[in-house]
Design a protein with these regions (language model features):
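A glycine-rich beta-to-alpha transition motif near the start of alpha/beta enzyme domains, typified by
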Residues: 1-116, 154-238
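Glycine-rich beta-alpha junction loops
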Residues: 9-11, 127, 148-152
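Short, solvent-exposed secondary-structure boundary/capping segments
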Residues: 117-124
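Beta-strand scaffold of nucleotide-dependent catalytic cores
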Residues: 121, 144, 210
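Active-site glycine-rich loop that binds ribose-phosphate moieties when present
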Residues: 125-143, 167
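Internal active-site segments that recognize and position negatively charged phosphoryl groups
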Residues: 135-137, 141-162
Length: 238
């Protein structure tokens, strides 16, 4: 079977996009190859090999389209904001569909608006949980659990550049508090309107960006840290 693969990215969060809308057998045929294709060392691609994951555009009985995502390790997350923006743009360009798209995800139906090369997504309402603390060596790490349809743990730090993300990310994600793992955001509030963030994503590792993570950081900032309703979140990818 021949499969056309398109690579797209949302501020550095890169994905392979595959059209499984017209031929549903494409999805099952691609599943065994996900880890190989996404490998940063030997995966698909030239300038930057591999990807953070693969997203499939599929038919839906309850929305315009259905999105199924697999992380680089093959796991299937509930939601990803950046890949949703990419797949909405892909669907619009491929099928010349409406500029307003309803896309089914594991976290529910999300509405996407396409305006030229810009795509916005209504992420829905966050769910907050009580402040938690995790022991790491001789330190207690406070964190704010938030669900944006997928799980996040937001950690406030003084300097995101010096955080050992590749150590603390998997350590927090593997804590019994999060039986299904968690995406971990390390944030510093620069001002009431600016947050700097780095992110460790379950099933991938540190990534250049995370849309749902940026939303989780923004709502934690507003609810607990004194930021304003409108805030700019700066990630490694932009």
């Amino acid at each position: 079977m021949s499969v056309l693969i398109t690579k797209m990215n949302g501020i550095g969060n890169d994905f392979f996009i595959i059209n499984a809308y017209e031929n549903t057998a494409v999805y099952d045929a691609c599943l065994p190859h996900i880890q190989q294709w996404c490998c940063r060392k030997n995966g698909l691609g030239t300038a930057r090999k591999g990807a953070d994951g693969i997203a499939f555009l599929r038919p839906s009985h309850i929305a315009d389209f259905r999105m199924t995502i697999h992380n680089a390790d093959g796991s299937e997350p509930e939601m990803c904001g950046n890949v949703l923006r990419c797949i909405a743009k892909f669907a619009y360009d491929t099928f010349q569909s409406s500029t307003s798209l309803a896309i089914e995800t594991r976290a529910g139906i999300k509405t996407c608006d396409v305006k030229g090369s810009d795509v916005s997504v209504n992420m829905g309402k966050p769910t907050y949980f009580s402040l938690k603390k995790i022991s790491f060596e001789d330190t207690q790490i406070p964190l704010y659990p938030v669900s944006m349809g997928n799980p996040h743990a937001v950690v406030v730090v003084d300097d995101v550049a010096s955080v050992p993300v590749d150590v603390l990310g998997p350590y927090i994600s593997s804590d019994p508090l999060f039986p299904e793992g968690v995406n971990v955001e390390f944030i510093h509030v620069v001002s009431p309107t600016n947050i700097v963030m780095r992110v460790w994503e379950r099933g991938i590792g540190e990534t250049l960006a995370c849309g749902t993570g940026a939303c989780a950081s923004a709502v934690v900032g507003h609810r607990f840290l004194g930021t304003e309703h409108s805030v700019t979140v700066t990630l490694r990818g932009g």
